[in-house]
Amino acid sequence: MPKGYVVRRGVQRGRLARNVVVIAGAFSLAIAGGAVTAVPAGADPAPAATDTGNQPATTTPTATTTPTVTATPVADTGAEPDPAVSRIDTVITGEGGQRATAIVYSASMRKMIPIEILRPKDSSKPAPTLYLLNGAGGGEDSASWSARTDYEKFFADKNVNVVTPIGGTFSYYTDWQKDDKALGRNKWTTFLTKELPPLIDQRFGTTKTNSIAGISMAGTSVLNLAINAPKLYKSVAAFSGCARTSDPLGQAYIQAVVGTRGHGSITNMWGLPGTAGWRANDPYINAAKLRDTKVYMTSGSGLPGPYDRLGAKGVENNLDSLANQIVLGGLIEAAVNQCTKDMNKRMTQLKVPHEVINRPTDTHSWEYWAQDLKTIWPKIAKDLGVK
């Protein structure tokens, strides 16, 4: 395991009032004239972060993210690895061989990054790759595809590699202009579009055909990644993401995620709000650049849906969880829904092909994203050439 990779597990429940202050504070800035833009948050709206002294946080794999292992290190040549070259340091294979964790060194970020990988049903021949991103917590908390969904079971009979990085908490999976005291060095666009794909292709013998999908915060990120690397992905799927980032409303939400929750500086990310860095990372402004990529977007209305009740998966019989999910999850998803409608209108005006699902109910919650993935998968599979 990479040095400093420590567990940060679980979103504390039962703190609804504090959650409302953190998230609703941003919404009060963003609701004007009936127009709402989304606060891209992680899976479960998290409590306000406590003061950590503004130091970089470190994280650790849980039993979910680290399978029972057979570790395959890179051959020792006797020489120190070149810090300017990204590499796969170790591959840890779980029982059955379909689940693996690769420890990847990123030269741009100068650190090891765990990558969760689901291998295809038939690994004897090349398969395409779906890059599947977590939300604001980066998978370092309990809010991750592996911890909150049955995605491993879903992909077990499919001939595709599913690649999910663990990290990037509150980073928007973007290249930050400056290092940040709280969130460290973030060069995620470089890592995800330039460093990681060739390593995955070489080590796992892929077809070099890719798609990408993400939820919440990463629903914004995947659109930007596809814009920045137009030939890398056949398709992009944004589940409950918000495409608008550079207008005052979008800036308020990013401040809520990066600043309020992450204790990071948004000026370290893209510069001063309103400057070129923000416009360059606004999928709404740059929507025309998605013309040659299949685009899928989903969102709910924010009204309670089938998983927003006691006894439902993810809620069980916890009243605090249900209150968080309905109040905060509903508020966030209502804003995301409007943002998705705005992006739909923008892409329609530009005549950029895309598909949108706006559900009449549903909150900002994992069970709906798990269903979104299953709903959109046949389209992504077709894009990737998976039969």
Regions found by a protein language model. Give the residues of each.
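Non-catalytic cap/lid and distal C-terminal segments of serine-dependent acyl enzymes
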Residues: 2-387
